[in-house]
Amino acid sequence: MSTNLVDYVDDSYLNQSMNSENGLDSVTQIMYDMKKYNIVNDVLPPPNHEDLHVVIMAVSYLLLFLLGTCGNVAVLTTIYHVIRSSRATLDNTLIYVIVLSCVDFGVCLSLPITVIDQILGFWMFGKIPCKLHAVFENFGKILSALILTAMSFDRYAGVCHPQRKRLRSRNFAITILLVLAVYAFITLCPLLWSFTAREIILYAKETAPGMLTRMKIEKCTVDIDSQMFTAFTIYQFILCYCTPLVLIAFFYTKLLSKLREHTRTFKSSQIPFLHISLYTLAVACFYFLCWTPFWMATLFAVYLENSANSSSVPPVFVYIMYFIHALPFTNSAINWILYGALNGQLQQRYRSNRSNSTKKTTTTTASTALLEKKITNLNTNSNYQVNGSMNSIATAAPTKTIGNNEVLVATSTIDDDVATDVVDVRLLSNHNPTFL
């Protein structure tokens, strides 16, 4: 950041001094009087494409981008095909899956921008794209987690309260999704509003009399004070992580308990309790594994920022943060497998649709063959009747002129069936009647 008079330069990247007493890297700040310089040259640092850790993370992010975008588009296409073919209305489960796939698709769209930012080491797209990037990434990830909570409630209501049909109606699902979207937006509104492309001066040096050269970059980050950011992080941790996690655990625990009770009461029950239990456990654990490290690392980073030894962060922590930051993206990139590809209702509809399509094709083929057979029999009977009535005429007079240039001719006689044909005599060498 710069003013008209002075620039405070964070020289911690290129000119760090070691404090011998506590063994910590101290940040050097240099003050320049900008009135002394007529020329100020701003340069960019070299990119990070030669850093192996950055390259590995960039490749990982790109793989998540391909997996998430292709997978979510495949789920949406399958649902569209099933609904269009069967001409059925959307139920609550498919509505949840559609909205979840759309939100996760938006989250995955932010990954290429993140990769570019990692490789370059700075933000190059300006302030407005920075805010849009924050909306797609942060708002999408939080809303995705809230939708997973709503889906767990939907399954809980279907098993534990089947008599309350309103809880699983389409209108109720749409209302819940709208409420969650507003909730996520209000929760993240201060953060999204404070995101901006912030200027940071890494290094500055007087390269000639009256000339100052600065290494200046932009970073897409929040522009609020430390205490406000700490309070907001804790508040977001409680509302956007702890609350959904507790609700998901509660709903799935109640669901499994109800199914276990049902299988014990009805020994001949056909409910695949073990399969449902493993699937539910996989869904809950996947959510926990993707989001818990992210929030723990975020809280730890806030603690380090507010502690006295904040400059003692080892470089390896930065790469660990990059890896942990990829976990919520992993959640969005794989949700379509757990909630779309493995969705029993969607699979059943898809198989039923394919089966109906196959039956329609078989029925159409059989109907066509039967129609052709009837037409053949009809033609045969018609020929027989005509030939039978014309037999005496053909015997007495082998040919009969129909028009000026046409004659009716007879061929062979086999079992009283006389094949007849009309020949255009203009095609013959002479106009004499000819038996074919």
Curated annotation (Swiss-Prot):
Chain positions carrying an annotated carbohydrate: 15, 309
Intervals, Extracellular compartment: 1-53, 116-132, 193-230, 303-316
Compartment annotation: Cell membrane
MF term (GO), any: G protein-coupled receptor activity
Keyword Transmembrane: yes
InterPro entries: GPCR_Rhodpsn, GPCR_Rhodpsn_7TM
Membrane topology: Multi-pass membrane protein
GO cellular component term of the entry, any: plasma membrane
Regions crossing the membrane: 54-74, 95-115, 133-153, 172-192, 231-251, 282-302, 317-337
Superkingdom of the organism of origin: Eukaryota
Gene3D superfamilies: Rhodopsin 7-helix transmembrane proteins
Topological region Cytoplasmic: 75-94, 154-171, 252-281, 338-436
Pfam families, per the entry: 7tm_1 (PF00001)
Coiled coil location: none
Keywords: Cell membrane, G-protein coupled receptor, Glycoprotein, Membrane, Receptor, Transducer, Transmembrane, Transmembrane helix
Family: Belongs to the G-protein coupled receptor 1 family.
Function: Putative receptor.
Full protein name: Probable G-protein coupled receptor C06G4.5
Lineage of origin: Eukaryota, Metazoa, Ecdysozoa, Nematoda, Chromadorea
